[in-house]
């Protein structure tokens, strides 16, 4: 009976909003602490998180809001300029739409950059910042990928030539970013090393869902972002330290097998958050909320319920 009531409450409080070309949806009871999920990109979407994790996280006592940034995913807008300021304006509108004055920000991948900059600009709107496989020192990530690539492809002369070409590109371009991540993908840097029954079932379930069918990636988004946004290859460690100094809790969780982060980068992040607010998940890569969903949800839930 309790399970039935929980399902009913989740349905009752799932509110789709399509105003101003922005797709968003809320899960859980609006009286519970709010969590806003910021997806990766540019050209990403919140489909995988929404289709696998949002509802379960909400059942732990949170009001979970997902949305796709303007010009990305289900938030189609040909006139989107893809700047951080544009995304901040839309995020502020999300707060208004759901009548939220303050929220916990849960940021994944590139969403970590956007969420960090937003928190620094609007600190009174953020209860805490949770970085999940989140970018924070972009050039260090690119350097790490390109440093390891020659050894991986040592017997592939065409690939070695491709790596050299990427290294010589302008480091503030969409082409450079794409080149680095394409190489990382070929090295299986985003892949879970040993899929479990649970993670496999989650992915199979997702691939049969409407979320998978509507998981649109806008190839124009990165091009617009690099054209219109000057902060397109930045290091946010100093900003994170300033946020922490403002007494806004910062939590970070990363996959041990997420190949786009070096050991040094993860040590730097732990130094910022503090050991108690930092966690590494074993047998886990970039998509933590699928690879090790239970551990991911437990970390987020426990930290947000016991801030400190």
Predicted regions and their residues:
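Conserved alpha/beta-hydrolase
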Residues: 58-74
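Conserved hydrolase catalytic core segment
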Residues: 101-145
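Flexible "cap/lid" loop of the alpha/beta hydrolase fold
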Residues: 131-172
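Alpha/beta-hydrolase
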Residues: 163-241, 247-248
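Short beta-strand/loop motif that positions the catalytic acidic residue
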Residues: 246, 252-254
